[in-house]
């Protein structure tokens, strides 16, 4: 029996495998996935249990703080992260989006520096979405992704170097139920990373780039250590020098914010910086402190990047990254053009401009946009205020952020019925799309992904849990939350196309907005609705 066949013992693919998919789900690639699972899944499960234990401590009132046991790492000025890899020196504007073929072509044709191809929050992880995404990136890297849809042709431009590709894998908490090893589903992280790396790492290096990743939803430096171990094994396995991979970590949980230096340290030979994951960070803030009434936040529109706890997080991230010689990436501009209202569009674009100006002046090295039309605005601002490829020389020695700063909930604003209805509308609309296999939904001219839906349902839970009173004088309780939910779900279902899933979304949402049950992640809660493991396909 060959080594590959030995690894494939007790490996099963429980999703359909098309002829196209066979070039991705090769025996060799599946054997590599099996090795990743068998080597790292026990550690992953232990780290996920650690999250549960930490939440229990926070519920008891033990709030996060900088770790005393890693103070020596923070205090040691001598170490640095890895130098920027080819194609990652200048990252002033990054476009993000799912990995469907049309998005891949449009993103790579945009006037941006990098494209974050997303298997995570802007993709619903149906088996077809995940496998087709791998096929599309495989083809894009080899410049064979052109296709025709109806009368429209989608072709990669050839007049300049294309943006650097960065793949975002799913977070450590998500499973891929269509691929099992020894009877267990593989981690979504290892599945997404493993297939992309195995097929494309050498091809990317040959083309002057490398296997680059965005790493989401981490909650501690130990989770970064696990990624680093995965990277080392993967590079050794295919005979690639260690330190070729790069990973940019999204700091989008409040616990990770206290461990930024340690996260860079754990990944130091593979680190390409940190990113401000705005909406997930707010979600994490509400989620982690949901049992504490003094952490109740006002309407989501009042929780801007300039409120104390968000401002502190941004400043600390920039200072930390530049101290260690890696990129400090800014957050998402989620606006999409308003084509039928010039005045409203101008106002929205001015908002984008102001946000990007705040980022570049703060010292960020680049920023995110969700729509190609915003790239020119972001580029214009960064080109004007950042003439160099990045701002690592901006050290922010003036910044001294304390634990109290990161936990400062002094947020001016109010809780309104309009805010409640907006949260219901966003949560229901996003969940309904996700249940149809769409992970990126335009709502009120904003491109919403899982993070914004998470903020919406977490706020509703928090307000009901603590019985807040709206500015109109209405007490938010279970009955009130469920009444408004029913009104919104009925209205959206009536207005939506035939066969929509708003009532199903409403049934799931009802369990999340009363201040009682609270699912760790909406995506985990809904996953069984869009996963359809069947009989095993032949390997």
Swiss-Prot record:
Compositional bias per record (Basic and acidic residues), positions renumbered to this chain: 65-78
Residues at the active site: 168 (proton acceptor), 449 (proton donor)
Location of region: Disordered: 65-86
UniProt motif Microbody targeting signal: location: 537-539
Any one GO MF annotation of this record: malate synthase activity
Cellular component annotations (GO), alphabetically ordered: cytoplasm; glyoxysome; peroxisomal matrix; peroxisome
The entry's keywords: Glyoxylate bypass, Glyoxysome, Peroxisome, Transferase, Tricarboxylic acid cycle
Family affiliation: Belongs to the malate synthase family.
Protein name, per record: Malate synthase, glyoxysomal
Gene: acuE
